[in-house]
Amino acid sequence: MRSLSHFLLSVCMIAAIGCSEEFTPTPYTYTKVFTGENNKTWKITLFEETLNGDVVDKFMIGCVADDRFVFYANTEHSFEAVSGSQKCFDDEADVTADRWTFSNATATLTMILPIFSDNALPFIVREVDSDDMEVEIFFDETNTGSYRIHFEAIDEE
């Protein structure tokens, strides 16, 4: 009796495994919200300064109003910060090329924003959809003060 139950259990397990649907992995596509199919261009529309989570000031920096930020969907995760005609610094490059990264676990988008630094910085993605994005970076050691940067998508390929 015991061997019959083992046999039936084995047959059921083989049948369950043999009849299961083939698993086809789908590629990770969440980052396409940043890049589109090939690339997506964003512009900054607003800065907010916060203190203890409350917005204390809203402003726009004139020299960044015509800058463009291009995220590419290639395997290198290429990124370009294209400076417009209004320069923030005398030695500001017309195009700053680098890489972008995104960590879903921490909602961190790492990229260069020349107004802050010539190096890539980690921004927390607060909200993002196909047309708008809001990122935040803290500027003090206690994480009580931050800048929130609002972007609008203006071109997608």
What is the predicted function of each stretch?
Residues S10-M13, K32:
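Detector for intrinsically disordered, low-structure N-terminal pre-sequences
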Residues M1-R2, S20:
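N-terminal hydrophobic targeting signals that begin at the initiator methionine
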Residues A15-G18:
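C-terminal motif of bacterial Sec signal peptides marking the signal peptidase cleavage site
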Residues S20-T96, S103-E157:
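Lipid interaction determinants
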Residues R2-S10:
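Sec-dependent signal peptide recognition
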